[in-house]
Amino acid sequence: MRTQSLYQPHFGHGSYTTRNVAKNTDIGKENGLISELVYNERQPAVAQLLLPLLLQLGKQSRWLLWLTPQQKLSKQWLQQSGLPVDKMVQLSQISPVNTVEAMEKALQTGNYSVVLGWLPELTEEDRLKLRRAAELGNAYGFIMRPQRDISPTHGHCSTLKIHSSLYH
């Protein structure tokens, strides 16, 4: 899994620990944030990293939006994870191009504390649009991207891999 902030200055204001996230139920009200998560679908690390943040964001009065063009969320998983099912909104069966536009519009509204979108590779212009929309709506936007298998012929990619065997 590789995470990459698309808005570096946000993290330049000091360390933001998990304790701070747990104490602050107004996450996303100070600044918007766009971050890209590249992950391996066979390893649960992304869910384990994102779930505490999503649980905290679920305490806000705003919605949590999932833009999933290819798949449908499992209601059973949502309930088991403790996420507020009544605050979840999912848009599926939309084209990847429309997903970028939908994510931008959703972030701008301020109606969502977080928008998770499974998007294709983005241009710098698209990233900038999403960052501005997140700032305007004071929301988190997570660009979710399953990891493509990296072939040795393409060289070494600088990524952090968290293996599921490290978790009990």
UniProtKB/Swiss-Prot annotation:
The record marks 168 as: Essential for degradation by Lon protease. Belongs to the SulA family. Residues 161-168 are annotated as: Lon protease binding. InterPro entries: Cell_div_suppressor_SulA (IPR004596), P-loop_NTPase (IPR027417), SulA_CellDiv_inhibitor (IPR050356), SulA_enterobact (IPR047696). Keywords: Cell cycle, Cell division, DNA damage, Septation, SOS response. Component of the SOS system and an inhibitor of cell division. Accumulation of SulA causes rapid cessation of cell division and the appearance of long, non-septate filaments. In the presence of GTP, binds a polymerization-competent form of FtsZ in a 1:1 ratio, thus inhibiting FtsZ polymerization and therefore preventing it from participating in the assembly of the Z ring. This mechanism prevents the premature segregation of damaged DNA to daughter cells during cell division. GO terms for biological process: division septum assembly; DNA repair; negative regulation of cell division; SOS response. The gene is sulA. It comes from the Bacteria. Residues 106-112 are annotated as: FtsZ binding. Interacts with FtsZ. Pfam families: SulA. It comes from Serratia marcescens. This is Cell division inhibitor SulA.
